[in-house]
């Protein structure tokens, strides 16, 4: 086997890897770099020489999915192999990406956008092939063949690791992985067989986990912190990834509410994450890979976030819990916009519930001391940090240990 990393930066970004097995070429994921703009965010797919015999899509986060339409445009005969749950999410997430890129073109003038259009997304949709878990799929050409099998990775709904068997050798690609069970998905269930090559993620590889850490206790700590803020008359902003993390937190809030342990305040959600609740509900009914029901929205009385944003610096008019994307507080997202209303007010809090890149606005905020200045440049507002900011370690990535 020969591996070529096509990621355009030596960091978490546009995940894409070419794996060659004899004369067969498989591409593992094809993402967009979340911190780069335009064509700079693409993986180096032009380096692929010759045809692509198959694409393995490990899951639907955009740093693994976002450039797939461009890869299929260059290699239209390639099939895209994914879990049954993942095939249900692809079109919605890519279509949303197009809308985001169109807005970016209007706002920044970047003529690269959109990088692809709906006809390109349709090509991806037609190329999708759902592969049942632990059920080998043979891919071959010119007398060469490999056997692929998918295994639950636990990271997010539909996520899988992939075992590739070729010429009596076994190569395992973990994709993004989490071994502990979450509310929407079981923990990773990888094969115990020895492998010749292991290709693994290392998102949290440089971060040690405290020996005393317990995810259940961390969730309890989050609920307690939310209640303390709300009971004192403040509001809580929970920035969350639209796909996966928002649905996890909804179920956590429902569990706390059912037990009588959640402050009786309104809960606001908006955008893609709210829409994706329907898709996870469908995946839960059609596959055994996801555990989610949109009934949670009714049980919690979820309210939509008003499109009429409050003037930056002025507190939100209604005390409550604001569960909004994006998880890293990316500019111009609902979470970023509401943060412009909350940070100046000491009764409020911003609680991060997932991984946050240090170079994103969320990472900057986590590292800021009280009283620091946080700039919302496109809003022409500089907030003085008076709200409480804290990170809760509820990542969907495996611990280093």
Placement of each model-derived feature along the sequence:
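His/Asp/Glu-rich metal-coordinating catalytic cores
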Residues: 1-56, 65, 72-248, 254-261, ...
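Short, compositionally biased "basic patch" segments
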Residues: 38-39, 183-203, 356-383
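Solvent-exposed alpha-helices and their adjacent loops that cap or buttress functional pockets
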Residues: 47-50, 189-192, 314-317, 342-343, ...
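A short secondary-structure junction signal
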Residues: 183-186, 209-211, 333-338, 362-364
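Hard-cation-handling environments
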Residues: 222-361, 377
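Generic long, charged, amphipathic alpha-helical segments
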Residues: 374-401
């Amino acid at each position: 086997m020969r591996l070529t990393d096509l990621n355009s930066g030596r960091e978490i970004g546009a995940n894409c890897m070419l794996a060659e097995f004899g004369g067969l070429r498989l591409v593992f994921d094809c993402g967009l770099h979340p911190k780069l703009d335009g064509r700079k965010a693409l993986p180096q797919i032009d380096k692929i020489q010759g045809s692509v015999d198959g694409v393995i899509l490990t899951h639907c986060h955009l740093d693994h999915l976002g450039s797939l339409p461009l890869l299929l445009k260059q290699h239209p005969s390639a099939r895209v192999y994914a879990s049954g749950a993942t095939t249900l999410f692809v079109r919605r997430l890519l279509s949303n990406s197009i809308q985001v890129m169109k807005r970016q073109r209007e706002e920044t003038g970047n003529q690269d956008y959109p990088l692809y259009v709906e006809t390109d997304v349709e090509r991806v949709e037609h190329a999708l092939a759902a592969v049942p878990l632990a059920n080998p799929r043979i891919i071959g050409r010119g007398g060469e063949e490999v056997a692929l099998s998918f295994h639950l990775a636990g990271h997010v709904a539909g996520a899988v690791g992939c075992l590739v068997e070729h010429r009596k050798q076994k190569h395992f690609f973990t994709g993004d992985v989490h071994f502990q069970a979450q509310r929407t998905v079981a923990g990773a269930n990888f094969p115990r067989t020895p492998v010749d090559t292991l290709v693994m993620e290392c998102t949290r590889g440089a971060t040690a986990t405290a020996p005393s850490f317990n995810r259940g206790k961390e969730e309890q700590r989050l609920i307690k912190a939310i209640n303390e803020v709300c009971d004192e008359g403040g509001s809580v902003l929970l920035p969350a990834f639209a796909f996966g993390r928002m649905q996890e937190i909804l179920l956590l809030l429902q569990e706390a509410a059912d037990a009588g342990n959640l402050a009786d305040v309104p809960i606001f959600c908006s955008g893609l994450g709210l829409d994706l609740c329907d898709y996870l509900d469908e995946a839960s009914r059609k596959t055994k890979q996801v555990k989610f029901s949109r009934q949670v929205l009714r049980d919690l009385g979820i309210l939509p976030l008003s499109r009429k944003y409050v003037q930056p610096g002025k507190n939100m008019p209604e005390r409550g819990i604001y569960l909004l994307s994006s998880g890293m507080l990316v500019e111009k997202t609902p979470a970023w916009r509401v943060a412009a209303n909350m940070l100046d007010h000491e009764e409020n809090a911003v609680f991060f519930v997932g991984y946050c890149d240090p170079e994103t606005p969320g990472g900057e905020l986590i590292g800021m001391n009280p009283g620091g200045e946080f700039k919302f440049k496109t809003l022409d507002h500089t907030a003085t940090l008076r709200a409480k900011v804290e990170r809760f370690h509820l990542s969907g990535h495996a611990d280093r240990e």
